């Protein structure tokens, strides 16, 4: 019995040991693996020719294996190592790819721009310099061609041989300082030693040290507004756009004028362009209310009313052009006196109603002593010159060497609805006012209505050595409201309508229709009216033309009478031009 009990205890121990051994040999259960679902590549562009550290964001964050393999699309642009360091090889764009290594086959890409890689240095071999002479005294931009085209550094340095004659900028803009010759030199900056030079001649630089030079609208307006006696404003050529009236209201002094002058020798004229204006009687271009101004060499274009209105006195307007304005190109009024308009042109002035706008007008309430010398007026809708009075009386206006032609016609040559006279001497609402007028060496030609028009002017009118050709009526001083006096000497009239020469007192002698003379086209070198439009001389004076110049043998030669004008030969010739041998 006791033996069985011992045997049973041994079997229990053995079973317990067997169970313990089995428990010790069981493994832990293996957890489930988490795969990569997406990748996102991060990294900066290479701009210095160096390298950039690439990185990757793995989703999900608890992916079991987050290691990636790196690759690039073009190893000639950049290479990448196993840690994601991207190294530049040459300039360009490369695609970087990250690939998961957990068997998920997930990839991601990013395009990287590579720049700043320096290749082999290519030196400059030659420089070609493009320059030209300066004839107008203005700045000029020069240029160069640097070869080879793939030179590493194509920058150049600009130099001039004499900085007292000209200055030149880093970009090759040359600024003339005075007339003369100067060498322009260009040197390569890459250390190659390549250089070239060219000599240029500078002309057209004016001495403007006595004034200021302006080249833009704002500076111009400021200079005009702040002008003082003796100031000189030199205006560079070009277009100056304005939308409102410019007031010249400062006063100069006798012998100490305020001057606005086109910059000497510029290749283009300064144009006051009022195209932005609407047509309105208040929209004058320039309002000159100041005294003692000198304005030379400007154009006034497309004002909404007068191009220039002068209400000041003792002003000189020289070599200016007034065109395509909506009223008179230049008008004198409001008591303005003793103004001189010298060598100016006024043409193509017309309003939108096609019935108004003169070339020049000294009219309405103008003052005494105004003069027009060497001026031309053509194809103005109304009159070439208008002297109609309202609000003043007994004034005298003088005209010397002035040409009025084709007035009453528009720019396109068609006839408009204006009065169409060359010189309208005067007239008034009550037909009583006196506008005295003196015309010497003046021409009226091709005007639609009258060449020299009385228009009920009650003043004294004088014509010395004038010519009237091809007008509706050449000289028309009728019997109604006749002039106080009419003096005509050394003047011809031909190829026009019937003339009349009525006045209370007349002194009419030695003219082309008197003393047995007849005037016709055979007396002249040319009767082509279009020649009157010929360009002026560079100093602004009238052109030398053949129109109405006497031919040798004309019976108008030496048939005049001395009226105090210069002449050659035994006596003055008849007409505006002395015969030239």
Language-model segments: residues:
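Right-handed parallel beta-helix/beta-spiral solenoid domain characteristic of secreted/periplasmic
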Residues: 213-215, 237, 241-243, 250-304, ...
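Acidic Gly/Asp/Thr-rich repetitive segments characteristic of extracellular carbohydrate-active
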Residues: 206-247, 573-576
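Predominantly extracellular beta-rich ligand-binding scaffolds that present long acidic/polar faces
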Residues: 401, 435-546
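Surface beta-loop-beta hairpin patches that serve as ligand-binding interfaces in beta-rich domains
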Residues: 536-581
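Parallel beta-helix/beta-solenoid
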Residues: 228, 250, 255, 267, ...
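Extracytoplasmic soluble-region selector
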Residues: 25-208
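Extracellular beta-strand/beta-solenoid scaffold signature
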Residues: 82-83, 171, 245-249, 255, ...
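Feature marks extracellular polysaccharide-active and adherence modules
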Residues: 236, 261-263, 289, 296, ...
């Amino acid at each position: 019995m006791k033996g069985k009990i011992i045997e049973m205890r041994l079997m229990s121990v053995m079973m317990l040991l067997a169970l313990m051994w089995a428990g010790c040999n069981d493994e832990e259960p293996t957890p489930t693996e988490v795969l990569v679902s997406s990748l996102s590549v991060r990294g900066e562009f290479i701009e210095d020719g160096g390298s950039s550290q690439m990185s990757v964001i793995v989703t999900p964050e608890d992916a079991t294996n987050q290691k990636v393999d790196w690759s690039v699309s073009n190893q000639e642009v950049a290479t990448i190592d196993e840690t994601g360091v991207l190294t530049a090889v040459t300039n360009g764009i490369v695609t970087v790819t990250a690939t998961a290594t957990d068997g998920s086959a997930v990839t991601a890409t990013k395009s990287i721009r590579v720049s700043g890689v320096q290749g082999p240095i290519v030196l400059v071999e030659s420089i070609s310099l493009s320059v030209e002479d300066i004839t107008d005294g203005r700045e000029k931009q020069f240029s160069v061609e640097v070869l080879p085209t793939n030179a590493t550094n194509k920058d150049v340095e600009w130099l001039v041989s004499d900085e007292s004659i000209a200055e030149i900028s880093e970009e090759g803009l040359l600024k003339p300082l005075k007339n003369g010759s100067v060498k322009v030199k260009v040197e390569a900056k890459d250390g190659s030693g390549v250089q070239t030079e060219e000599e240029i001649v500078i002309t057209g630089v004016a001495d403007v040290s006595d004034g200021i030079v302006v080249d833009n609208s704002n500076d111009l307006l400021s200079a005009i507004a702040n002008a003082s006696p003796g100031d000189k404003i030199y205006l560079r050529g070009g277009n100056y756009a304005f939308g409102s009236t410019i007031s010249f209201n400062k006063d100069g002094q006798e012998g100490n004028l305020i001057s606005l002058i086109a910059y000497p020798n510029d290749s283009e004229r300064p144009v006051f362009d009022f195209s932005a204006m609407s047509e309105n009687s208040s929209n004058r271009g320039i309002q000159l209310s100041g005294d003692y101004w000198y304005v030379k060499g400007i154009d006034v274009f497309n004002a909404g009313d007068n191009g220039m209105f002068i209400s000041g006195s003792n002003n000189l307007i020289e070599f200016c052009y007034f065109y395509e304005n909506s009223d008179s190109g230049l008008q004198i009024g409001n008591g303005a006196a003793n103004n001189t308009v010298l060598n100016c042109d006024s043409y193509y002035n017309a309003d939108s109603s096609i019935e108004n706008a003169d070339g020049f007008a000294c009219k309405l309430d103008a003052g005494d002593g105004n003069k027009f010398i060497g001026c031309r007026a053509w194809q103005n809708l109304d009159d070439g010159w208008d002297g109609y009075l309202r609000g003043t009386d007994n004034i005298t206006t003088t005209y010397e060497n002035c040409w009025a032609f084709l007035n009453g016609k528009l720019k396109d040559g068609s006839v408009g609805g204006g009065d169409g006279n060359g010189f309208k001497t005067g007239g008034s609402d009550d037909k009583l006012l006196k506008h005295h007028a003196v015309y010497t060496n003046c021409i009226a030609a091709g005007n639609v209505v009258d060449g020299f028009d009385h228009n009920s002017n009650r003043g004294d009118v004088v014509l010395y050595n004038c010519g009237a050709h091809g007008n509706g009526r050449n000289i028309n001083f009728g019997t109604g409201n006749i002039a106080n006096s009419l003096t005509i000497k050394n003047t011809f009239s031909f190829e026009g309508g019937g003339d009349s020469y009525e006045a209370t007192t007349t002194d009419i002698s030695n003219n082309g229709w008197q003393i047995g003379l007849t005037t016709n086209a055979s007396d002249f070198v040319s009767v082509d009216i279009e020649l009157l439009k010929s360009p002026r001389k560079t100093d602004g004076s009238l052109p030398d033309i053949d129109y109405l110049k006497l031919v040798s043998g004309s019976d108008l030669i030496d048939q005049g009478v001395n009226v105090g004008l210069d002449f050659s030969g035994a006596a003055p010739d008849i007409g505006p031009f002395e015969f030239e041998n």
